[in-house]
Every structure is written in C-alpha cells, then in structure tokens.
C-alpha cells in the first residue's frame, strides 16, 4: 500500500531518484533498494532518496507501477551533469493560473479564459494575449491580489522538495514565469529558488492600470534568461 504513493520522478543511467509528497520510511527504501538491486542509497531528505542502479534492474513490478502515473525516464551519464532547474510557475509550480484567479475575483473570469482559449486555437502570440487579458483587469484593487495570494494560490505538492533538493545537490534553480512578480517573489522565497523572473504589473493609486511594465517574459525571453 505504501509503495503506491512513491513517485519516481526521473531515472538516470546509473541513478534513480525517488521523491514523494510524504515522508519515505525505511521499509519503503528497503523495498525499492531490493527491487532495483541498488548498489548505493543516498537519502536526499525526508521525501527524497537516490539509488545507484543500472536500468536493466528496473523490475517488471516497477514497470507496472509506471502505468499508475509514475514517471520513469532514462538519460545518459553525460546528461546527468545538470546544473540548472528552471520551471514555469502558473499551472506548474502552482496548481492555479494567477491571472485566472484574479479575473474570477473581479468578475472577468470567463472573458479572460476565452482570450486564453482563442490564443491557443488561433495562434495569438503571448504578448497580445497578455495585453488583452490585463486590460480586463484594469481598475482592480491591490487588495484583490493580496486575497488571491493568501487564499487562492497553492504550491503544487512536491515542488518545494524538488527545488530545495536540486539546489542542495546539483546546482541553481529558477522560476521563469509569464505571470506576475507580485506572486513569483513570494513563491521564490518558499522554494528558496536562486532566481525568479516574471512580468511586473503596473498600478496607480492602489489599482491596476491594465498594463505590465518592462520586458514581457514570453517564451523567447525565457530562453534568453536561461542562456
């Protein structure tokens, strides 16, 4: 029963890193060690364990677990030398899309989602889509953002463990978001991420102007930042 909640997030040529949203106990570690025929076990934290293992030792039982939404991936030893973990924020680190939550609170949820759907269907570029959606939020009070952050936004289970473990053992971490710094600055602190980039909402006299200031963090900008 317990082993079903374990989530192997990625398997390398000579290593298998297992993470869970709950504490991994000694019996679960022993189960995985035996079935992987692991030569070495390194406990990365209460919710993470690394096994030195050969891919041939992935058993049929663990392959069966893969069909139950467990993600098992192989990469070469050369590819293992990863030094940067970069992730989107909205809908990735966070369970929600911040702009949708803000829009819901000001009665513009369906309109904002309609623009998003149109952009995906008709190829409207991100900058145009963002400008149209932000225009619908014009006049919203900053208290709406505060309420959204404290009551509506949830960090996805495992995200904090992933970021902190990667930072401790591998390299730098970054959040690259097409969302907003109002939220990403708070999330960066919780993740203990090294870097965080997002769009800056413009406001005057405590209300949103319906615009963003500075360079828009779109797909091209994210690529530039990673370089």
Where are these regions (language model features)?
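Non-catalytic pre-domain segments flanking phosphatase-related domains
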Residues: 3-87
């Amino acid at each position: 029963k317990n082993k079903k909640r374990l989530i192997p997030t990625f398997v390398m040529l000579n290593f298998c890193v297992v993470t869970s949203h709950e504490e991994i106990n000694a019996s679960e570690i022993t189960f995985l060690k035996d079935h992987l025929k692991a030569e070495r076990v390194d406990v990365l934290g209460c919710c993470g364990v690394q096994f030195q293992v050969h891919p041939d030792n992935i058993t049929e039982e663990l392959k069966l677990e893969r069909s139950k939404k467990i993600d098992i991936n192989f990469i070469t030893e050369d590819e293992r030398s990863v030094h940067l973990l970069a992730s989107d924020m909205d809908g990735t680190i966070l369970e929600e899309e911040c702009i949708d939550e803000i829009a819901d609170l000001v009665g513009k949820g369906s309109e904002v989602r309609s623009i998003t759907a149109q952009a995906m269907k008709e190829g409207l570029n991100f900058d145009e889509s963002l400008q149209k959606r932000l225009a619908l939020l014009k006049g919203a009070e900053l208290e709406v953002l505060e309420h959204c952050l404290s009551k509506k936004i949830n960090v996805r289970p495992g995200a904090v463990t992933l970021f902190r473990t990667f930072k401790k053992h591998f390299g730098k971490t970054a959040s690259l978001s097409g969302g907003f710094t109002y939220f990403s600055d708070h999330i960066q602190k919780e993740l203990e991420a090294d870097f965080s980039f997002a769009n800056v909402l413009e406001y005057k006299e405590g209300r949103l102007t319906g615009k963003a200031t500075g360079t828009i963090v779109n797909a091209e900008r994210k690529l530039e930042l990673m370089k």
